[in-house]
UniProtKB/Swiss-Prot annotation:
Residues of the signal peptide: 1-21
Cellular component GO terms, alphabetical: cell outer membrane; outer membrane-bounded periplasmic space
Cofactor stoichiometry and binding remark: Chloride.
UniProt protein name: 5'-nucleotidase
Record-listed a divalent metal cation 2 binding positions: D88, N120, H221, H256
UniProt entry tagged with the keyword Ion transport: no
Gene: nutA
Enzyme Commission (EC) number: 3.1.3.5
Length: 553
């Protein structure tokens, strides 16, 4: 970590703050008894998806067309627009990751984002990369609760003031304090991620004294948890709204938990939201809370009316960006647009295409070398423990700082041959873009889980590969479970990883996404394996060879 870069950012934030402090807040600019229209558009958890996926869904070119059209329509009716992002622009697909998300940040600038919250994945790279990204963005990256440990000063602009037809809007940025424990220690050792609730309280007091805004919006990367039940995660948006005096924040535009925040009733999230469904935002302690799922799949739209200092939401919806659904046509399954197709912006496509092509080229660059075959052939990996299955599990275990790891063999799609290894080889093994997730459970829960997962039959994708654990599997249950060299204790707490697909119940695994100890790390499996291969090259395949840890009888 380079202190010069930190100091540069601290000085920049300090200058901004001092200038704000010197200025006298202007008198009220809006007209009494006049109704103003204000629309907040928002996305979150972009995770490198600047290009459409293989089915032609989402992507920044289609998003630009949609947002340009919305902005034009709203302004033609006399309204104003503010476009916000809940953060996590980084980490998701190799074409973006290999280029430090340059197409993503520059693409956001072209779309016209007004501000974003810093997400935890903005700290997956060295700070030099983040400050470079800050220069690519022509909009402020906000976070009031990130401090430099050495100076005690904020690293980033805590808030930004916008004027929309005389309505003074303060937008505060907040970042989950969990970044301190899920981020890379090498890059964040000198950074203090403070309690965002406390920092919000401080900043709001400062704003009321110095700026006297008409509206205060928090753009956050903290997560939305039903009824504030955040489990092992740091408190999220619901806790923030409840912590502050009623109505202190007019709105929270969130991210991090990567879900559509659509409510069925008070403190009850709507399950299985689909494109085109009605979406009612959460309301907590007088504050609207919204989130637009992930990857630019939706653009959230909140329409407000502002009159005599009062803000009222008129409507809210999540607009799908070329999402598709499966239908049966003449006995064959096809994907069709769930709603009307959005044409991709040609200028944005022209801008992004060189980045996509460059990213594809970089996939052929050598990342590691192996002295033997890493076994992932379907007729082997679905029948027995293999060195590749174990390596993938070990990579997940290391990234999540877990005690052991579970990896479904159906997620291992190919072998890696001896010799040079490229990223393309990795993507052949793990092409699905599953996310590494983990859960903290007590020993009894772990035993119950293993009794289901470890007993899955061979010759199926559900057959599990393991790392960090040994056991005997017989008569439909497990015994002699040893984790970290010690016998399983029913009253102890253990952390294990599992692909997001299986965490959601895929392959008939127990669904654990609702478990209070569950965490979706946001790290894509192929990226995690790539990093592990690079760090451990040259690869000695014998190191990963199973040694009878899992005994089937």
């Amino acid at each position: 970590m380079k202190q010069g870069l930190i100091l540069k950012s601290v000085l920049s934030a300090a200058i901004i703050a001092s200038l704000a402090g010197c200025a006298t807040a202007p008198a009220q600019q809006w007209e009494a008894d006049k109704t103003y229209k204000l629309t907040i558009l928002h996305t979150n958890d972009h995770h490198g998806r600047f290009w459409q996926n293989q089915y032609g869904e989402y992507g920044m070119a289609a998003r630009k067309t949609l947002i340009d059209q919305l902005r034009a329509d709203i302004e033609a009716q006399g309204g104003s627009v503010l476009l916000l992002s809940g953060g996590d622009i980084n980490t998701g697909v190799p074409e973006s990751d290999l280029q430090d998300a340059e197409p993503d940040f520059k693409g956001m600038s072209k779309i016209g984002y007004d501000a974003m919250a810093l997400g935890n994945h903005e700290f997956d790279n060295p700070l030099e990369v983040l400050f470079k990204q800050k220069e690519w963005a022509n909009f402020p990256m906000l976070s009031a609760n990130i401090y430099d440990k050495a100076t005690g000063k904020r690293l980033f602009e805590p808030y930004h003031i916008f004027d929309k037809q005389g309505i003074k809007i303060a937008v505060i940025g907040l970042t989950t304090e969990d970044t301190a424990k899920i981020g890379n220690p090498e890059y964040i050792g000198g950074i203090d991620f403070r309690d965002p609730k406390e920092e919000a309280k401080k900043v709001i007091a400062e704003l009321k004294k110095k700026e006297k805004p008409d509206l205060i919006i928090a753009v956050t990367h903290m997560g939305h948890y039903q009824n504030g039940e955040h489990g092992v995660n740091a408190p999220g948006d619901v806790a923030l709204a409840r912590y502050l005096p009623a109505g202190e924040l007019d709105m929270i535009v969130g991210g991090h938990s990567q879900e559509p925040v659509c409510m069925e009733g008070p403190n009850l999230v709507k399950k299985n939201f689909k494109p085109g469904d009605e979406c009612k935002p959460d309301i907590q302690n007088g504050t609207y809370i919204v989130q637009a799922y992930e990857w630019g799949k939706y653009v959230g739209r909140a329409d407000y009316e502002f009159r005599n200092g009062e803000l009222n939401m008129v409507s809210y919806n999540l607009i799908p960006v070329n999402l598709k659904k499966k239908v049966e046509v003449n006995g064959e399954t096809q994907r069709v647009f769930a709603t009307s197709e959005i044409k991709e912006d040609s200028a944005m496509l022209e801008f992004l295409r060189p980045f996509q092509e460059k990213g594809q080229e970089q996939l052929s660059i050598k990342i590691a070398h192996s002295n033997g075959k890493l076994e992932g052939d379907r007729n082997v990996v679905r029948f027995e423990q293999t060195n590749l299955g174990r390596m993938i599990a070990m990579a997940h275990m290391q990234r999540a700082k877990a005690d052991f790891a579970v990896m479904n063999s159906g997620g291992v799609r190919d072998s890696i041959q001896a010799g040079d290894i490229t990223y393309k080889d990795v993507l052949k093994v793990q092409p699905f873009g599953n996310i590494v997730s983990y859960v903290d459970m007590n020993g009894q829960e772990v035993l119950d889980y293993l009794n289901v997962v470890a007993t899955k039959p061979v010759d199926s994708g559900a057959y599990a590969q393991f790392a960090g654990i040994s056991m005997t599997v017989a008569d439909g249950k497990v015994s002699n479970v040893v984790i970290g060299g010690k016998q399983l204790r029913l009253d102890a707490t253990y952390r294990f990883t599992v692909p997001s697909f299986n965490a959601a119940g895929g392959d008939g695994y127990p669904k654990i996404t609702d478990h209070p100890g569950y965490v979706n790390t946001g790290f894509v499996d192929a990226e995690v394996l790539k990093d592990y291969l690079e760090a451990n090259s040259p690869i000695d395949v014998n190191r990963f060879a199973p040694a009878g840890e899992i005994v089937y009888r």
